[in-house]
Amino acid sequence: EDNEQLLLIIGATAALQALKSDVASGRLINFDMGIPAKVGRAMDCLDNDKWWGEPKAIQAGLTVILPKSAEDEAEGWKALQDATDIGLQTGVRLSHATYASIANMKGREDYLRDSLKRFESIPVATLNSQYTLLNAMAELQVRHIANIYWMKYEGHRAPTENFSKFWDEQEKPSQALNQLLDDL
């Protein structure tokens, strides 16, 4: 039964990616818009805590992509953040990748920055070794999104480390340090 549930999560995540790609292409792919409702209902059958918060992240992602109201969208963003908290506790970063992907797709830099910070704050030593492949896939996706974001503003890919410490947040040398250098 666990394998079936895992396959359901992977399939639902792929469906969310397909929807995201269709929306980003201006509906050129012609993704069947009946699928998101089915995927959302299917996620109700899964234990959110057992599956690292990804079922609720998928549902929240669908809500953010296809909101019924501004309130629903705001609740969707909150649910995405909550899902990453569960991912942090369970050591699987799939919900973090979902959050970053949705934030990137919607052009919400505030949530994108938050998602990258949340992702990078997870110590590698705490990752669940049983799901190394899923964590590696999540890392590739988040790194790709971070690289696109950094290219947009800085003209180069994201740093290998501290990619969530953004250019406008970089620490400036103190005046005292500058004074010491001037005295040389």
Give residue ranges: language-model regions.
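A cross-kingdom marker for long, charged
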Residues: D82-I86, T90-L184
